[in-house]
Structure formats: C-alpha cells, structure tokens
Amino acid sequence: MQPYKRAQRLKVLLKEEVAEIILHKIKDPRLGFITVTDVELSDDLRIAKVFISVLKTEDRQLTLQILNDAKGFVRSEIAKRLRIKIIPTFEFLFDESIDRGFRIDQLLKEIKKTSEEV
C-alpha cells in the first residue's frame, strides 16, 4: 500500500511544480493560457505523462511542440526543486476529456430540446 501513497503524493506534487514551471520559467511568447489538468506516472515512476488544456484550440499542436521541446528543461527544474531519487521523463499530451465533456453536454442539451419539442 505504501508505494501507492507515495505515487499519489508525487503525482500531485509534480502537477503543481510543472504548472509553476510552465507559468514562470518557460518564457516563450507563443505559449498561451495553459492548464495542467493531470499527471499520470508509470508504475516505476520513471515516466510522467502531463496532460494539459489550452484556452485557444488552434494553438494545441504548437503548444504541445513547445512543451515537448522544453521537457529537458522541465526535468532539470524538477530536479532542482524536489529531492527524489529518480526524476521522471516528461511527456506532454493534450487532455481530450475536456472536449469530450463539452460534447456530452451538447448532446444532453440537444436531447432535452428534442424531448421538449415532442
């Protein structure tokens, strides 16, 4: 049970620290408003998948490219901030769950509208 608790604590800590690094340390004017929505860790804690959402949907690919190009920098910043034995390798991915949530909301509104018309 203990490794699970450690992994959960590390996941929360990495989410906060990566968000802080993106906000204050990565100085790329092409980056817009980015939210770190989740972090998934591999079982051995060596790989961290960082899920992000971007305010402007047209900037998704560019944002992912910039962040994935800066993942070495993010890793070095994490190494400076945290005292952990293994610093995970980062992979940035777009969080599709937000889009799915909007789509489900749209479908529910359409169903409600259709049922009211009948």
From Swiss-Prot:
Pfam families: RBFA (PF02033). GO terms for cellular component: cytosol. Signal peptide: none annotated. It is found in: Cytoplasm. The keyword DNA-binding does not apply. GO terms for molecular function: ribosomal small subunit binding. It comes from the Bacteria. GO terms for biological process: maturation of SSU-rRNA; ribosome biogenesis. Keywords: Cytoplasm, Ribosome biogenesis. PANTHER family: RIBOSOME-BINDING FACTOR A, CHLOROPLASTIC-RELATED (PTHR33515:SF1). One of several proteins that assist in the late maturation steps of the functional core of the 30S ribosomal subunit. Associates with free 30S ribosomal subunits (but not with 30S subunits that are part of 70S ribosomes or polysomes). Required for efficient processing of 16S rRNA. May interact with the 5'-terminal helix region of 16S rRNA. Belongs to the RbfA family. Monomer. Binds 30S ribosomal subunits, but not 50S ribosomal subunits or 70S ribosomes. This is Ribosome-binding factor A.
